[in-house]
């Protein structure tokens, strides 16, 4: 019998108990942790390659997050009945885990590391994202890899003016905030949130609250590490060649500084490439055996130093702006003739062409996940083609980054979207990034707000987004508004804020260094507010409120109510009636259990015809009313006449004419149209009709 020795740590976290266990499962991995929060359990494994591949100039960290349907007691759909490619939710959670752990690996570490998180049990009330992040932090902490953790994680809600630690799924429905914050003992590293237009101070308070509360997570992981950690890897950061650093500085510093005063991105990149090539040629001429990878790395470090030192010294930014300035804006709405709504939003060298398409409830996205089934009426898709940065590349299914940016923009807009009762349409927005030089996701937020208004979607108010950056050297720091791509790459923080004039709807923060304190975040939020209001003012000049009507090319949804008992009549046997209705009128018809009927069509006449026919089908037969009917069957004792769709009545032979009728066929033929009067509807729903009573009465003869 194999002897196993589990090491377990448990602690209370909000209203849930968190358990971390190692030593039983997946013992051949460098580290494996079974992490549980309530009944939601994930298995996290970490494996790192012991040797670095020659020639590699990046850190190959891979995070794979996978939700197994057996965790929820389900069998996968589809022909093969097994899990397939990652869903959007799995991709987003993988990114959520990756972002805070990546900066905790030391510079120069380039060994391949793979983290696999497998959801093996799920409580529909407890989302696996936070416990997956906690489990990943614990597994990395005990793996022996050079990881500067552990990392703490907390979800924060905000209900009735109070912060809530680790709210469950039901509690989040009534919460004005859904915020996840991750950080080390002394610093916040990542924030991801969605909010109902909350003030800056409430958002900042949520970040601080979450960071304070997650210290219990860090303590528990440290205890686990003390008992279960593998031996630390014998890895040391590569030592820089001081002579080579000095030579590169002499060769390229002045030229690099000059290149970074070129404001046009493509021209600047070309000149930076020229400077680097010249430096490499000079160094290789001096020493043909020089390590090109090392030279490239040192040139990159010099590039970073040149840009950062200028900003810290108070010099103008790369494109000549002051720290709090927003690039020039160009905003247009209604730029495409046949789309339901469109906008072109340009900020400096970043541009988004955004379209809005309206559809019926049938067009909504139906999602079946391990957390349950739900429907998305509002979809936002972000595309980043290679031409947007002047490159060639693969065009196909969306990458992780595109999915993540689309979701961030969705969070920024979702708080102002109308309810289904206010606007019974499904809405799909697509943001095509046509130019990119920093903060394309926030350009998507601005463009989406404009396109929705152009489409006539009654959003509550305009929404704008802005990306903030940071350069910090020692105690000196500069917060930058509307960062360029270079400032994002070479800076210490990417801080994206979307919101209205009243508050923040989405906040995403990724920090690459330790030491970001409350003061810096406060300054960034205040600066972001000023930039956001400036952008909103420009947007409102293009279109300040939603159009009064939707596009002529959009389907118009007309709603009517019928008796719920009549739904089966509208559907017909095997769906024949509703199928004929939709095909013959060219409309889309949706029925709800409460008797609500939604008819969608871009053609008003088609809608009217569909309404008329549905009203006919669902109309009640009224005693005493005269109908234009059609003979459908003749029998010896009379004729059956259709007076409404699906409703026949009997004209008895005695009710066909005033005179005595011997043979019904002498008076009536199948298909003949006749006027009939409803005489009676019995308890069984049988209708008695009369042609005699429907005929005009002869005028009384005058008295003699």
UniProtKB/Swiss-Prot annotation:
**Localized where?**
Cytoplasm
Q: Which residues form the S1 motif domain?
A: 624-692
Keywords attached to this Swiss-Prot or TrEMBL record, sorted alphabetically, are: Cytoplasm, Magnesium, Metal-binding, Nucleotidyltransferase, RNA-binding, Transferase
Q: Extract the coiled-coil ranges from the record.
A: none
Chief location category: cytoplasm
Q: Where does Mg(2+) bind?
A: 488, 494
What positions does the domain KH occupy? 555-614
PANTHER family (UniProt xref): POLYRIBONUCLEOTIDE NUCLEOTIDYLTRANSFERASE, POLYRIBONUCLEOTIDE NUCLEOTIDYLTRANSFERASE 1, MITOCHONDRIAL
Question: What's the protein name?
Answer: Polyribonucleotide nucleotidyltransferase
Q: Which organism is it from?
A: Shewanella sediminis (strain HAW-EB3)
User: Gene encoding this chain?
Assistant: pnp
């Amino acid at each position: 019998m194999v002897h196993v020795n589990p090491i377990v740590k448990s602690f209370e976290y909000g209203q849930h108990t968190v358990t971390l266990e190692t030593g039983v499962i997946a013992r051949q991995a460098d580290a494996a942790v079974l992490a549980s929060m309530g009944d939601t359990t994930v298995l996290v494994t970490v494996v790192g390659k012991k040797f670095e591949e020659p020639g590699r100039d990046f850190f190959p960290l891979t995070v794979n997050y996978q939700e197994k349907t057996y965790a929820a007691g389900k069998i996968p759909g589809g022909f093969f009945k097994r899990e397939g490619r990652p869903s959007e939710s799995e991709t987003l959670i993988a990114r959520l885990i990756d972002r805070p752990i990546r900066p905790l690996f030391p510079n120069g570490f380039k060994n391949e590391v793979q983290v696999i998180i497998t959801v093996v049990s799920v409580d529909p009330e407890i989302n696996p994202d936070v416990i997956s992040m906690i489990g990943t932090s614990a597994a990395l902490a005990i793996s022996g890899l050079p990881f500067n953790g552990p990392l703490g994680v907390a979800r924060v809600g905000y209900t009735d003016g109070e912060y809530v630690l680790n709210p469950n799924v039901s509690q989040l429905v009534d919460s004005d905030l859904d915020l996840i914050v991750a950080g080390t003992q002394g610093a916040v590293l990542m924030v991801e949130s969605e909010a109902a237009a909350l003030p800056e101070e409430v958002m900042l308070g949520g970040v601080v609250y979450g960071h304070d509360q997650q210290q219990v997570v860090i303590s528990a992981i440290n205890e686990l590490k003390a008992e279960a950690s593998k031996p630390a890897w014998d890895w040391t950061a590569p030592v820089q060649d001081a002579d080579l650093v000095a030579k590169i500085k002499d060769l390229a510093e002045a030229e690099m500084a000059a290149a970074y005063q070129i404001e046009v991105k493509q021209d600047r990149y070309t000149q930076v490439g020229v400077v680097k090539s010249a430096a490499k040629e000079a160094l290789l001429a001096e020493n043909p055996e020089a390590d090109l990878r090392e030279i490239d790395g040192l040139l990159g470090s010099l590039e970073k130093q040149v840009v950062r030192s200028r900003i810290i010294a108070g010099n103008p930014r790369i494109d000549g702006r002051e720290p709090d300035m927003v690039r020039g804006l160009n905003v247009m709405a209604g730029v495409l003739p046949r789309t339901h709504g469109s906008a072109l939003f340009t900020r400096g060298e970043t541009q988004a062409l955004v379209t809005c398409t309206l559809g019926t409830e049938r067009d909504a996205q139906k999602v079946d996940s391990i957390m349950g089934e739900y429907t998305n009426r509002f979809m936002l898709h972000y595309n980043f083609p290679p031409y947007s940065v002047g490159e060639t590349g693969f065009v196909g299914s969306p990458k992780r980054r595109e999915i993540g940016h689309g979701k961030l923009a969705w969070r920024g807009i979702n708080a102002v979207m109308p309810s289904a009762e206010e606007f019974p349409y499904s809405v799909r927005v697509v943001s095509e990034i046509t130019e990119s030089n920093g903060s394309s996701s926030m350009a998507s937020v601005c463009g989406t707000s404009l396109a929705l208004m152009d489409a006539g979607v009654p959003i509550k108010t305009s929404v704008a987004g802005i990306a903030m950056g940071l350069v910090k050297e020692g105690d000196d720091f500069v917060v930058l508004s509307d960062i360029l791509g270079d400032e994002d790459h070479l800076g210490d923080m990417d801080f994206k804020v979307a919101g209205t004039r009243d508050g923040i709807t989405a906040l995403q923060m990724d920090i690459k260094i330790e030491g970001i304190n409350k003061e810096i975040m406060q300054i960034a939020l205040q600066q972001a507010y000023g930039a956001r209001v400036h952008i909103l003012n420009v947007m409102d000049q293009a279109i300040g409120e939603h159009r009064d009507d939707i596009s002529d090319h959009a389907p118009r949804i007309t709603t009517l109510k019928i008796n719920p008992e009549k739904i089966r009549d509208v559907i017909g046997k095997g769906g024949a009636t509703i199928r004929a209705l939709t095909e013959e009128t060219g409309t889309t018809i949706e029925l709800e259990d409460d008797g609500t009927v939604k008819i969608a069509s871009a053609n008003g006449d088609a809608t009217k015809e569909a309404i008329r026919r549905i009203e006919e089908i669902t109309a009640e037969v009224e005693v005493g009313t005269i109908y234009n009917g059609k003979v459908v069957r003749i029998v010896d004792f009379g004729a059956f006449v259709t007076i409404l769709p699906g409703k026949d009545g009997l004209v008895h032979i005695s009710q066909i004419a005033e005179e005595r009728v011997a043979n019904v066929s002498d008076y009536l033929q199948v298909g003949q149209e006749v006027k009939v009067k409803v005489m009676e509807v019995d308890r069984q729903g049988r209708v008695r009709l009369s042609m005699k009573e429907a005929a005009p009465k002869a005028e009384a003869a005058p008295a003699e």
